[in-house]
A protein has these predicted regions:
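Short histidine-centered loop motifs in beta-beta connectors
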Residues: 40-49, 53
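Amphipathic, alpha-helical segments enriched in basic
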Residues: 6-8, 25-28, 47, 147, ...
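N-terminal, Lys/Arg-enriched amphipathic/low-complexity engagement segments
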Residues: 1-43, 58, 93
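Intrinsically disordered, low-complexity boundary segments flanking structured domains
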Residues: 15-20, 53, 78-82
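N-terminal start-of-chain detector that recognizes signal peptides
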Residues: 1-6, 13-17, 45-48, 64, ...
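Residue-level marker of beta-strand positions
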Residues: 49, 55, 71-73
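Iron-sulfur-associated redox domains of electron-transfer enzymes in respiratory
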Residues: 63-83, 88-185
Length: 185
């Protein structure tokens, strides 16, 4: 097959290229109990107090965990419009108390391979593809010879990866070190 023409899209990154990332702190968050064909079960009840990083739901099939991004009070668990599909799915509604109370430990420690993999699993990290495969499963009982860190933006308007690399460089490098430790043989 011979390449006959290259389609090049106009780059519009200048619209956000120099803009710092800003935090949008919502009054409410809605955490869907459905994603990638996985149904989640809430670990909370209405009026429960939630801290940032606290487990709020667990997957039925994969045991993947979902955590709260804010601290506050659970105000409802009912059907809301799910942006990915347009369908109504059960969601946990949490009213933000703006206190940022957290159960997350921000320690910079050197972890062993198995502990890093366990932390990935407990963090509920899944793949961004359609299957939502638990990331920790990719590291268990496997060795790798190469790590590719892809910092390229795939859209002509998007600069979020670029801005993260500029603004959170140390965290990115630390994360790469942890992944390298997790994949070592």
């Amino acid at each position: 097959m011979k390449l006959t023409k290259i389609i090049e899209f106009k780059n519009n990154k200048q619209l956000t290229f120099n803009n710092n990332i800003i935090d949008y702190i919502p009054k409410y968050v809605y955490i869907p109990l459905f994603d990638n064909n996985e149904k989640y079960v809430s670990t909370l009840q209405i009026n429960d107090y939630v801290q940032m990083g606290q487990v709020v739901a667990k997957g039925n099939k994969t045991n993947t965990l979902i955590h709260s991004s804010i601290s506050g009070i659970v105000t409802s668990i009912d059907k809301k419009m799910y942006i990915n599909s347009g369908l109504k799915v059960n969601c946990i509604e949490i009213k933000n108390d703006y206190n940022n109370n957290s159960i997350i430990e921000n320690k910079n420690c050197i972890y062993e391979k198995n502990e890093i993999i366990k932390r990935i699993e407990n963090s509920g990290i899944i793949g961004m593809g359609g299957a939502g495969f638990p990331t920790a499963q990719k590291y268990k009982n496997k060795t790798f010879s190469t790590l590719i860190v892809n910092g390229c933006e795939c859209e002509p308007f998007i600069t979020c990866d670029y801005r993260l690399m500029l603004e959170q460089t140390i965290k990115l490098i630390n994360g790469i070190h942890y992944v390298l430790k997790a994949i070592e043989g």
